[in-house]
Amino acid sequence: MNEQNAEITLEVGEQEFTFNLTPADVTKYFNALTQTNKVAPGNNLLMTTVKQDKRATLKPLLGNPVMVMQLAGTLLEEYAPDVEVIVKKRSATLSA
């Protein structure tokens, strides 16, 4: 997989689930999030990116919305690039 596509394995209890994430998957997830819709996009992200042979095992775990958010959050955190970002302080002096 290249730098933008990632195969990520999460261990949940005694089960391992491998997910294949692409930029398109992550973009679709973020675009689906709304103020009143957070769990369904997470559920969709998990179910569409988990390896086919583990879907049936994963599905019952996603009945708990907190589990959905925890797994999706962990998956996205692992997918995120490791980049150092620094915010520069503004000058207190106004310029004309």
What are these regions (language model features)?
Residues N2-A6, Q15, N20-A96:
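Short, surface-exposed, charged amphipathic helix/loop patches that serve as local interaction elements
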Residues T9:
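Carbohydrate-active enzymes and regulators
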